[in-house]
From Swiss-Prot:
Keyword Aminoacyl-tRNA synthetase on entry: no
GO MF annotations in UniProt: D-mannose binding
Protein's recorded name: Early E3 18.5 kDa glycoprotein
Lineage, highest ranks first: Viruses, Varidnaviria, Bamfordvirae, Preplasmiviricota, Tectiliviricetes
Keyword Transmembrane helix assigned: yes
Source species of the chain: Human adenovirus C serotype 5 (HAdV-5)
């Protein structure tokens, strides 16, 4: 009986000793920006000494990096979850995406391409302009054909 009590206490002591508290270190993250096709692209890369990490930003998840296109109105927050064994810890970050994209998109701002306007307005303007140019080209072509054929007909009559 005493042997079972001692064996039970030793089992409890050994089980308690194996559950170690994991000391999570904050991951080192780097956020870079680029101007591509009048869009502010962001790349979030993180490194850690733990087993695994996941980065979440704008409904995108990446293991060590996340690539996204940022526009005004999008969230300025991202989080990094670090895993070690069965334990994990989430670190929340806020970054001034608007200010950084504003600086990155300097040339696009010069041509009024940043911040992006309502897509419907841009598409509507483009369609109306394209239609106007097409109609103008058609009218000019028809007038050219009409007057050229008339001139050639008149010149044929003048010939003896």
């Amino acid at each position: 009986m005493i042997r079972y009590i001692i064996l039970g206490l030793l089992t409890l002591a050994s089980a308690h000793g194996t559950t170690q508290k994991v000391d999570f270190k904050e991951p080192a993250c780097n956020v870079t920006f680029a101007a591509e096709a009048n869009e502010c692209t962001t790349l979030i890369k993180c490194t850690t000494e733990h087993e695994k990490l996941l980065i979440r930003h704008k409904n995108k998840i990446g293991k060590y990096a996340v690539y996204a296109i940022w526009q005004p109105g999008d969230t300025t927050e991202y989080n990094v979850t670090v895993f070690q064994g069965k334990s994990h810890k989430t670190f929340m970050y806020t970054f001034p995406f608007y200010e950084m994209c504003d600086i990155t998109m300097y040339m696009s701002k010069q041509y009024k391409l940043w911040p992006p306007q309502n897509c419907v307005e841009n598409t509507g303007t483009f369609c109306c302009t394209a239609m106007l140019i097409t109609v103008l080209a058609l009218v000019c072509t028809l007038l050219y054909i009409k007057y050229k054929s008339r001139r050639s007909f008149i010149e044929e009559k003048k010939m003896p």
